Amino acid sequence: MITDDKVTEIFCTIDEFCKKLDVELQKNLKLPSSDGSGHRRRNRKGQLSDSEIMTILVCYQFGTYRTFKEYYLCSARQRMRSLFPKAVSYNRFVELMPRVFFQMMLFMKLAAFGSCKGITYVDSTMIPVCNNVRRYFNKVFRGLAKDGKGTMGWCHGFKLHFVCNDSGEIITFCLTGANVDDRDRRVWDVFALELYGKVFADRGYISQSLFEMLFDQGIHLVHGLKANMRNKLMPMWDKIMLRKRYIIECINELLKNKANLVHSRHRSIQNFIMNLCAALTAYCFFDNKPEALPVHVEKSMQLELF
């Protein structure tokens, strides 16, 4: 169970970011005082601040409760009553959640995520939204969720592609349908904006065209070999770092088992996106993030092509 000290730490970090963001928005963003019909626009503050809403969403991802309604009613409004004295009703809080999407995305990207350090690991994981038997009856994600097959079998939902550095920090992510291949160029166009150096992947990313495209952009894709492939020479340092892909596997484990990234109780697309952002944001506050063992890194800016 998350402690009050941890909740306070999360709130102070988010609140400080939100205050700086509000100052920048007031300087550079000019909102109209009225809408097109001539009526004045309301700008009244609510009982819960944006930082409090974001804190409640992030704290839910620490794995104590499996349903958000039980967490909010039993924990946020009772056990943490002293921390959130002006907590609104559950139905009202669900309506307020999409309001902090902009702030949550900026905090996740600017404060929670790390940066590329030249050593990157890439992986993807399935996010099912319902049982495969009920995929034809799902109305919430109709037209958005897709059928795809992964290492664990068929899945109806989405696929989360993400990359992390050797310190266990998530760099960026890309959400697609479950039927999108890991080697899809649209996914790597997003990743290439943040990456440089070497990217270590599993055998599912084997593609000559992908390797050449990334190599032209200064990114060296390193992956293992399949059993029916011809053996190729590989530097010993690449073999050592390729075996350290447990870093991103541990991140997958934390997001799925500790955080509530995967469940089939979403009632709207907006809440699904907010739950995804909250899970990725909460990961940066976990105390048991994986970290690679120190190894000797050769100081060379030259890419290796075989």
What are these regions (language model features)?
Residues 1-306:
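Short alpha-helical elements
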